UniProtKB/Swiss-Prot annotation:
Location within or outside the cell: Cytoplasm, Cytoskeleton
Family affiliation: Belongs to the profilin family.
Key words, A-Z: Actin-binding, Cytoplasm, Cytoskeleton
Entries under PANTHER family matching the protein: PROFILIN (PTHR11604), PROFILIN LP04 (PTHR11604:SF67)
Assembly: Occurs in many kinds of cells as a complex with monomeric actin in a 1:1 ratio.
Protein's name in the database: Profilin-3
Gene Ontology cellular-component terms listed: cell cortex; cytoskeleton
Function: Binds to actin and affects the structure of the cytoskeleton. At high concentrations, profilin prevents the polymerization of actin, whereas it enhances it at low concentrations. By binding to PIP2, it inhibits the formation of IP3 and DG.
GO terms assigned for molecular function: actin monomer binding
Short name of one Pfam family: Profilin
Length: 131
């Protein structure tokens, strides 16, 4: 299965009648493995900040998480494993695997819990597969 198929079939799939607004699978170095068409264009320093927060949990808390110039307030995640952010009625979930970052961005009516489920389920699967 291609990485694009993982984005299309596992991240942008319908869950309880809702879908993520955008999603991507990135390498730890910021390389794009696959992304949905409307995934925000991000800067290398934004990816570096995300990776640093996984290495040093709490790094992004004072400044917020930026992706594509959009600022998300960092909310409770799982240190070193999952970063969660909130912006207005939407937010972001990022799951780290051994080789990749799985990102899902949502807006209402999708709930944070639904986004977490979609992103973390794929991340756990990829970890089990050695990624």
């Amino acid at each position: 299965m291609s990485w694009k198929a993982y984005v299309d079939d596992h991240l942008c799939c319908e869950i309880d009648g809702q879908n993520l607004t955008s999603a991507a699978i990135l390498g730890h170095d910021g390389s794009v493995w696959a992304q949905s068409p409307n995934f925000p264009q991000f800067k290398p320093e934004e990816n570096a900040g995300i990776v640093k927060d996984f290495e040093e949990p709490g790094h992004l808390a004072p400044t917020g998480l930026f992706l594509g110039g959009t600022k998300y307030m960092v909310i409770q995640g799982e240190p070193g494993v999952v970063i969660r952010g909130k912006k207005g009625t939407g937010g972001i979930t990022i799951k780290k695997t051994g080789m990749a970052l799985i990102l899902g961005i949502y807006d209402e009516p999708m709930t944070p819990g639904q986004c977490n489920l979609v992103v973390e389920r794929l991340g756990d699967y990829l970890i089990d597969q050695g990624y």
